[in-house]
């Protein structure tokens, strides 16, 4: 009895799983950077690995206690759908939390967060 068909099936499943994992839009560059200490930034900027679905992707800035800091909507750059920004008001010295949701154009969704400090 040969195990060749089973091996081929296993390889196919692993290949499909690997391709699906790459379809998620994960951050490749963030400004401000995670755990950084900065002067009040004018915006939060995140570059993603995949193009984003503008209506479903967002950035939110909160205080460490969870209060929303910026009421402005985030936006995906029309010239570069991998780039999303959130305009910020002048921030007081404190720790802030960037919460992001990325939905790739193929529908895959990821969420994450990171902190930075304004001095």
PLM feature spans:
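Extended, polar beta-sheet/loop recognition surfaces of beta-rich domains
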Residues: 39, 44-50, 107-119
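N-terminal edge beta-strand
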Residues: 22-40
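Short, surface-exposed alpha-helix to beta-strand junction/turn motifs within ectodomains of secreted
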Residues: 45, 51-72
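N-terminal signal peptide c-region/cleavage motif recognized by signal peptidases
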Residues: 18-20
């Amino acid at each position: 009895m040969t195990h060749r068909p089973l091996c081929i099936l296993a390889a196919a499943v692993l290949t499909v799983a690997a391709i699906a994992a790459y379809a998620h839009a994960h951050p490749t560059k963030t400004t401000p950077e995670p755990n950084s200490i900065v002067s009040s930034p004018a915006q939060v900027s995140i570059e993603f690995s995949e193009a984003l679905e503008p209506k479903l992707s967002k950035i939110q800035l909160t205080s460490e206690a969870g209060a929303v800091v910026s009421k402005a909507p985030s936006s995906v750059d029309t010239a570069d759908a991998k780039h999303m920004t959130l305009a910020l008001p002048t921030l007081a010295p404190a720790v802030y939390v960037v919460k992001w949701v990325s939905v790739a154009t193929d529908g895959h969704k990821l969420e994450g967060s990171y902190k930075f400090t304004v001095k």
